[in-house]
Regions:
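Residue-level recognition of tetratricopeptide repeat
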Residues: 45, 79, 113, 146, ...
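Structural marker of alpha-solenoid helical repeat scaffolds
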Residues: 66, 99-101, 131-135, 166-167, ...
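Helix-start (N-cap) detector for alpha-helical repeat units in TPR-like alpha-solenoids
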Residues: 71-72, 104-106, 136-139, 171-173, ...
Length: 282
């Protein structure tokens, strides 16, 4: 009787374990699937942000061959093509995205950015016009400002640049763009202030430094501004000032600036040497 009870208990235990195994297996598989989805999402984010742009393009192209209906992969491909400097190819991909029923306002903003990179200003404006006014982002206003610039709608441009600058903790880029807009309008004093502000946020931004010197030279301020500069940067900016001085007829000042650029540069400054030689032989 005792043997029968033990056998019965043993059999019950085996059946119970078997039932548990049957119950747990799908749960384990579901858990693994969830992990795979998370890993895939993380990998997609990595590819779109920090991975080598061309590697990211290859990754999304391979992924779309396996799963052509994945709109997130299509978005990833478009963004990666932009990062890789292949805006013309990205435009083709964005055409598919904005034609999809899941298109978002951000998709249209991204498409507008790609269109601007290929000088398709009117098409870019058309895409932004399809974005509802309630969708307010830094990127949207930055692009709107650039489009307003292209239309010479200066009041709109200034308004959009100001809004964009207030919507980011890193406004150096948009302030530099705004300054360049002022520079092209001939408002050199305002441009100078904006370039200085841009540099205050990013002390290594050479484009803003060069633009600052252009704005100052346009006002015949032929001295370097009090900003952080390397020797190489100092030499390049002196050369920039010299070129501006030549264009404004201040040839003697240009000679002095070129001589300073040659003396300041830690390496042989061929461009400055050739420009000075041309001036002296003219």
């Amino acid at each position: 009787m005792r043997l029968f009870s033990v056998a019965t208990i043993g059999l019950a235990a085996v059946l119970a374990l078997s039932s548990c195994a049957k119950l747990k297996k799908p749960s384990v598989e579901k858990a693994i699937d969830s992990v795979n989805v998370i890993d895939s999402a993380n990998l997609t984010d990595i590819m779109m942000t920090v991975a080598d742009p061309n590697e990211a393009v290859n990754y999304f192209q391979r992924s779309l061959q396996k799963e052509p209906d994945r709109i997130d992969f299509t978005r990833g491909l478009a963004k990666s093509l932009i990062r890789a400097g292949r805006a013309s190819e990205a435009m083709v991909v964005y055409e598919k995205i904005v034609a999809d029923k899941t298109v978002t306002s951000q998709d249209r903003v991204n498409f507008a950015g790609a269109l601007i990179r290929t000088n398709e200003w009117k098409r870019a404006e058309a895409q932004l016009n399809k974005v509802p006014p309630t969708y307010e982002t830094y990127q949207r206003y930055r692009l709107a400002a650039m489009i307003a610039d292209s239309n010479k709608a200066w009041k709109k441009s200034d308004s959009f640049y100001e809004i964009a600058a207030g919507m980011t903790t890193k406004p150096a880029g948009v302030l530099n763009n705004w300054g360049y807009s002022k520079l092209t309008r001939g408002d050199f004093a305002a441009a100078e202030k904006l370039f200085l502000e841009a540099i205050s946020y990013d002390k290594k931004m050479f484009t803003a430094k060069n633009n600052l010197v252009l704005a100052r030279a346009s006002q015949r301020k032929y001295t370097l501004p009090v900003i952080q500069l390397t020797q190489t940067e100092r030499a390049k900016l002196l050369h920039t000032m010299a070129i501006s001085a030549i264009k404004q007829g201040d040839v003697d000042i240009a000679r002095g600036l070129l001589a300073d650029a040659i003396d300041t540069s830690p390496r042989y400054f061929d461009a400055a040497v050739r420009t000075l030689a041309a001036l002296n032989n003219s």
